[in-house]
């Protein structure tokens, strides 16, 4: 009798773990939150991604219209490092400025070897605010910034939220070391180099 109870308990625990693992990869944390104390933030818990062959990769408007229709996976607490792939990879994160007085931020991708990187900034209700291009395959006059390391401006007043989508296509390893930086922190880091 005791053995049956233990067996049933173990099966139930295994089922709960299995269901939790199946649900876990779909989403990261809801948002990367900027507080009054934030100058820089690595948003990995809020980042999710999926990759697909070029012919199956959604157009931006198709993705933005129904983002939950795609097979997102959470990156966890680490940066995405997908290795070499011919697939087109989409990344998503939500950024919320809880109470930081700084409006001007930068999304920095600390990896200069990405071939093509398109970044889309949307409001929380889906209105597209900006589209930026960067990467080794982009002409310098088409890039969002003059630095070799891609970075993108992000206007985010206190109390507001933005949806960020990044599309990466690269003949090199796809890594996405992200950092959100206040404009003063970004300027200071840029001057230090």
Model-identified regions with their sequence ranges:
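Bacterial N-terminal signal peptides
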Residues: 12-21
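Bacterial N-terminal signal peptides that target proteins for export
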Residues: 2-13
């Amino acid at each position: 009798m005791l053995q049956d109870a233990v067996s049933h308990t173990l099966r139930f625990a295994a089922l709960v773990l299995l269901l939790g693992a199946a649900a876990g990869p779909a989403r990261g944390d809801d948002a990367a939150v900027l507080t009054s104390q934030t100058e820089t933030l690595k948003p990995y818990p809020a980042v999710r991604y999926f990759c697909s062959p070029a012919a199956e990769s959604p157009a931006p408007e198709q993705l933005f219209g129904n983002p939950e229709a795609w097979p997102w996976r959470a990156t966890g607490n680490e940066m995405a490092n997908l290795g070499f792939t011919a697939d087109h990879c989409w990344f998503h994160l939500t950024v919320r400025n809880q109470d930081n007085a700084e409006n001007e931020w930068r999304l920095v991708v600390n990896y200069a070897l990405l071939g093509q990187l398109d970044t889309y900034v949307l409001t929380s209700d889906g209105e597209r605010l900006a589209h930026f291009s960067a990467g080794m395959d982009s002409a310098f006059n088409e890039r969002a910034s003059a630095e070799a390391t891609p970075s993108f401006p992000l206007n985010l007043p206190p109390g507001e939220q933005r949806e960020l989508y990044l599309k990466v296509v690269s003949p090199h390893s796809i890594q996405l070391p992200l950092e959100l930086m206040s404009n003063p922190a970004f300027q200071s880091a840029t001057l230090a180099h």
